[in-house]
């Protein structure tokens, strides 16, 4: 019995227009902070499609520049950072869903899409991992900023965790600022109608539950009157070594019994691609 051909959406720009969505060939990734290094290492979005409270696309590497201007003692100071990230070093499909308020930075690393190493582009430090009871730990590793463990449990209730397992068990999930973002290493096939059906299902299940669950969240570490804010320690997870360095370490460990000259050569090749 032959397999039925998958339905294709055709031209992405026309597909977006037909559905009342906006198509942009390139754009910035979602939920970037004012940190210059975060901006220049985040990659660039290609084929961005956005609707009411959500967006989707593909993030790849490339050249990025970010700058910040401020005045000090009557002097204008401009800081500019430029980085050329190899295009193929970042390749992530994503769906980002707007939430009602800013939240602590939380990451769910899906175990299903990991190889020897995590598939996350920016791996949080292991000390920030929060272990959970039940089946959830079999599907995801949860990371929360130090001191925000109870906040993470407030967000990821058992019913939301069950939806995450059912609908996004093969995808990495991140809550950053006021966005819930799911990622797929290697990208989503945006020309496949099934991809858009899955996006709609994730929005109506995970997205809807996350919205109602986080609407009443308050960070009691911030000053009264700033209820929509998150304390400085909760805004971003602390990162581990960049992926390229982790790969180098893994390769070096695998060849630990080989002559030191071989290990040094491996490090030099990997380092040149960072």
Give a label for each model feature.
Residues 1-3:
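N-terminal pre-transmembrane cytosolic regions of membrane proteins
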Residues 6-250, 271:
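Charged, low-complexity intrinsically disordered regions
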Residues 252-264:
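Canonical alpha-helical transmembrane segments of integral membrane proteins
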Residues 261-274:
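Juxtamembrane boundary at the C-terminal end of a transmembrane helix
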């Amino acid at each position: 019995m032959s397999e039925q051909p998958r339905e294709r959406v055709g031209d992405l720009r026309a597909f977006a227009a037909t559905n009342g969505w906006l198509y942009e060939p390139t754009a910035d990734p979602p939920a970037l902070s004012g940190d210059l290094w975060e901006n220049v290492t985040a990659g660039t979005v290609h084929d961005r499609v956005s609707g009411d409270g959500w967006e989707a696309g593909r993030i790849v590497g490339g050249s990025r520049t970010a700058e910040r201007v401020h005045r000090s003692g009557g002097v204008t100071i401009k800081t500019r950072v430029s980085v050329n990230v190899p295009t193929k070093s970042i390749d992530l499909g994503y769906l980002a869903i707007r939430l009602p308020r800013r939240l602590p930075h939380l990451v769910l690393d899906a175990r299903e899409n990991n190889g020897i190493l995590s598939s996350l582009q920016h791996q949080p430090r292991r000390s920030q991992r929060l272990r959970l009871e039940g089946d959830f730990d079999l599907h995801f590793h949860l990371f929360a900023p130090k001191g925000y463990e109870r906040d993470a449990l407030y967000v990821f209730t058992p019913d939301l965790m069950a939806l995450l397992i059912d609908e996004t068990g093969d995808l990495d999930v991140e809550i950053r600022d006021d966005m819930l973002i799911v990622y797929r290493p290697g990208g989503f096939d945006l020309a496949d109608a099934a991809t858009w059906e899955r996006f709609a299902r994730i929005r109506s299940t995970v997205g809807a539950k996350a919205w109602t669950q986080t609407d009443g969240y308050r960070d009691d570490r911030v000053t009264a009157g700033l209820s929509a804010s998150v304390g400085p320690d909760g805004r971003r997870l602390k990162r581990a070594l960049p992926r390229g360095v982790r790969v180098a370490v893994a390769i070096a460990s695998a060849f630990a019994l080989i002559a030191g000259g071989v290990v040094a050569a491996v490090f030099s090749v990997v380092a040149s691609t960072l």
